């Protein structure tokens, strides 16, 4: 009799757990669509000059996790093509932080792709609102109720297309990790969070950042990091130097150094700069003659 009673209890307990699980899944599915509309409104209320469209939102009640899928970001001045597409953005509780009595979040951007061209850049230059004040940090923080402690990007992609017959500037397989973000507000030029970034430049060169950041700095984050560029094709710099009548052909660039970029300081210290097999020409153009004379005059004055 006792064995039958115990068996019945297990049957009821198992049934209750199954029903609870099914109920949670059904509730989650019913909430997804309303949550998607709410999340879009919340994000767009914080952004200036940009609009977010969400393909879907999925809440996972058991892990208290949130997935945003097919996230598309457009610049309102130039809505086509979009400036960013994120197949999946996941936010969840950082469970290991609970061991230290901290209730914080992990954020993961899976294979995000960013596309910029000269129209996007010129629209930013004309705008009265600086890019750093567009509300990006506020929008990111609005996604999840917990404060972000770890932020990761896996296999990101960045493309910039300039005018003229230049190859697009392309960074691929970008992996980024920032930890200990929700530290206390730091004094100026103190960077409490660890960060690391690596990626490919033009499929052959590499870029690495290894340093620290202050993600609570305002109006934008502060970074102090060592950097390494290895075997980067000079094609990467053609659109930039062409504005100064300089033509680059072939060759690679490698460099190491330190950079500091924060609200009150922007400094780069080069420790090594190596340029190999580069062909460089200066081309005089009639339409830039006045600007050339102005630059030459400044050089003479400084000399």
PLM regions and their residue ranges:
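Amphipathic hydrophobic-ligand
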Residues: 49-51, 68, 77-92, 131-134, ...
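Flexible beta-edge/linker motif
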Residues: 56-123, 136-161, 185-192, 256-283, ...
């Amino acid at each position: 009799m006792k064995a039958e009673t115990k068996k019945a209890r297990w049957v009821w307990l198992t049934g209750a757990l199954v029903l609870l699980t099914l109920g949670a899944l059904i509730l989650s599915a019913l909430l997804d669509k309303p949550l998607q509309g709410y999340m879009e409104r919340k994000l767009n209320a914080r952004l200036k000059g940009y609009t977010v469209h969400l393909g879907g939102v999925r809440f996972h009640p058991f892990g208290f996790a949130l997935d945003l899928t097919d996230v598309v970001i457009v610049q309102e001045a130039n809505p086509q093509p979009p400036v960013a597409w994120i197949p999946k953005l996941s936010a969840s509780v950082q469970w290991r932080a609970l061991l230290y009595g901290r209730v914080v979040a992990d954020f993961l951007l899976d294979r995000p792709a960013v596309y910029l061209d000269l129209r996007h850049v010129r629209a930013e230059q004309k705008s009265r609102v600086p890019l750093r004040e567009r509300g990006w940090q506020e929008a990111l923080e609005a996604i999840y109720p917990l404060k972000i402690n770890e932020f990761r990007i896996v296999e990101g992609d960045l493309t910039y297309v300039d005018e003229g017959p230049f190859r697009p500037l392309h960074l691929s397989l970008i992996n980024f990790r920032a930890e200990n973000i929700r530290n206390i507000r730091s004094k100026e030029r103190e960077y409490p969070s660890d960060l690391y970034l690596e990626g490919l430049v033009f499929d052959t060169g590499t870029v690495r950042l290894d340093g620290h950041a202050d993600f609570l700095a305002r109006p934008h984050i502060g970074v102090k990091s060592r950097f390494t560029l290895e075997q980067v094709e000079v094609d990467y710099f053609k659109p930039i130097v062409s504005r100064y009548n300089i033509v680059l052909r072939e060759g690679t660039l490698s460099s190491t150094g330190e950079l500091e970029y924060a609200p009150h300081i922007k400094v780069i210290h080069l420790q090594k700069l190596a340029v190999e097999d580069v062909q460089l020409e200066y081309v005089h153009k009639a339409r830039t003659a006045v600007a050339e004379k102005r630059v030459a005059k400044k050089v003479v004055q400084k000399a």
